[in-house]
């Protein structure tokens, strides 16, 4: 929650499997677990956005539904023009949708030990940085900027 609060968004949309659809009007937060209606969720976020106020969209476990998903791709490609910030969470780099990898500038990375993910990181990072990531302690992270 610290990361979300630091964004200081006027409206927050969270797609999370574990929660029921709720709207907290006093906090301007919409939480949905309905991945069957991604188009509606993304449209609500788009409609709430404007150049004058920040809209934050959070996709939890994006690897489960974000691959080749036109509504999510639209938010990634054009959202920055309408002050939309996106946070996407996933367990593994290799499972991130291509649109997420290509449009993300900052990653918060916890310990990575999976060989496939370490190989992915080696293409973009120094050997020392990959080593640091593979040896991170529990609940510690590094910020990567691309």
Language model segments and positions:
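Conserved P-loop NTPase motor cores
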Residues: 1-5, 18-21, 30-129
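Exported/periplasmic cell-wall-interacting domains
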Residues: 26-27
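Phosphate-binding and hydrolysis-coupling loops of NTP-dependent motor/remodeling domains
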Residues: 119-146
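Post-Walker A helix-loop "phosphate-sensing" segment adjacent to the P-loop in P-loop NTPases
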Residues: 4-14
């Amino acid at each position: 929650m610290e990361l979300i609060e630091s964004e200081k968004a006027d409206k927050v949309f969270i797609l999370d499997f574990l929660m029921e659809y709720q709207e907290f009007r006093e906090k301007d937060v919409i939480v949905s677990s309905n991945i069957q209606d991604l188009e509606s969720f993304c449209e609500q976020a788009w409609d709430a956005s404007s150049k004058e106020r920040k809209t934050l969209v959070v996709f939890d476990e994006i690897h489960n539904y974000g691959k080749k998903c036109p509504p999510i791709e639209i938010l990634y490609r054009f959202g920055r023009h309408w002050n939309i910030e996106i946070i996407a969470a996933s367990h593994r780099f290799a499972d991130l949708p291509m649109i997420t990898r290509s449009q993300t500038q900052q990653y918060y990375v916890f310990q990575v030990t999976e060989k496939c993910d370490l190989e992915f990181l080696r293409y973009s990072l120094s050997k020392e940085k990959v080593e640091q990531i593979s040896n991170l302690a529990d609940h510690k992270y590094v910020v990567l900027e691309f």
